[in-house]
């Protein structure tokens, strides 16, 4: 076991040991790589869900009552959902959510591991981890349409001088739509590595050539990135039925003054 994995496990063991002794804690769930320890490396954070009795949520939300080694914290902050994030002086990251068992039913989950369960936690986690996540429910025809839309949308923002907004549209929205279309169309090299909730996670292992192409494209200026992404979509998905619609690609190119695809 690597030093990173040992340190990761020891920190989690300490937190769980502390939390499981508290009468208002119903359960503790490890999420993401905190659950799937095979993925742990030096960059892995800790992501935990703390399930509590009704009325105890605020006692755990800011982390002040349970985060270990508080003297080493650089910051801890509460987010809109009542959980929070913290960072230690060595760069160790922690994020957490807090809910009652009933409140947990409104969550979404992918990889998880129930560590403490004093009633109902495992059942609810099984339910929410199998629930469809509409934002990642791939539909190739829809997703390619969104991809083409975002190319024009993003380049338009760029030509207005809104470079930050444009960059987000092209590098996040357009790329996300393209990857969703790919997932609906092209078998992954290793489907098990893909994340159900975040379509950008571990694409490099599932579609290595495509991921490398997209990374190179996104390193360019916004408009060059957008134009490269259109070429990448056509190269990987094809132009015409079942791929990038020819009339849609032509309309994008004509509107933006690019060479015909």
Positions of the model-derived regions?
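Conserved nucleotidyltransferase catalytic core and NTase-mimicking acidic/glycine-rich helix/loop elements
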Residues: 132-261
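Acidic, glycine- and histidine-enriched catalytic cores of nucleic acid- and nucleotide-handling enzymes
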Residues: 87-124
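Hydrophobic C-terminal alpha-helix "anchor/cap" residues
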Residues: 18-20, 28, 174
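A short, charged helix-loop
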Residues: 112-142
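Short aromatic-enriched loop/helix-cap "lid" or pocket-rim segments at secondary-structure transitions
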Residues: 40-43, 108-109, 196
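Metal-dependent nucleotidyltransferase catalytic core
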Residues: 1-17, 21-23, 34-43, 49-97, ...
């Amino acid at each position: 076991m690597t030093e990173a994995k040992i340190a990761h496990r020891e920190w989690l063991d300490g937190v769980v040991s502390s939390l499981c002794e508290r009468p208002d804690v119903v359960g503790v769930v490890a999420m993401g790589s905190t659950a799937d320890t095979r993925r742990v490396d030096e960059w892995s954070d800790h992501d935990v869900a703390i399930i509590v009795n009704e009325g105890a949520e605020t006692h755990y939300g800011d982390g002040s009552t349970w985060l270990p080694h508080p003297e080493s914290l650089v910051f801890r902050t509460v987010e809109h959902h009542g959980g929070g994030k913290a960072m230690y002086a060595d760069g160790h990251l922690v994020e957490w959510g807090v809910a009652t068992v009933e409140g947990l039913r409104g969550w979404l989950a992918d990889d998880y591991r129930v560590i403490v369960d004093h009633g109902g936690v495992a059942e609810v986690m099984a339910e929410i981890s199998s629930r469809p996540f509409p934002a990642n429910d791939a539909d190739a025809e829809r997703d390619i349409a969104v991809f083409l839309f975002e190319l024009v949308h993003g380049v338009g923002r760029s030509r207005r001088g809104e470079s930050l907004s444009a960059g987000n549209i092209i590098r996040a929205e357009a790329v996300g739509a393209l990857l969703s279309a790919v997932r609906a169309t092209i078998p992954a090299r290793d489907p098990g590595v893909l994340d159900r909730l975040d379509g950008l996670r571990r694409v490099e292992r599932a579609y290595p050539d495509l991921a490398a192409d997209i990374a190179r494209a996104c390193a360019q200026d916004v408009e060059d990135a957008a134009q490269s992404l259109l070429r990448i979509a056509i190269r990987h998905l094809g132009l015409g039925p079942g791929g990038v619609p020819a009339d849609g690609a032509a309309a994008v190119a004509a509107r933006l003054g690019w060479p015909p695809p």
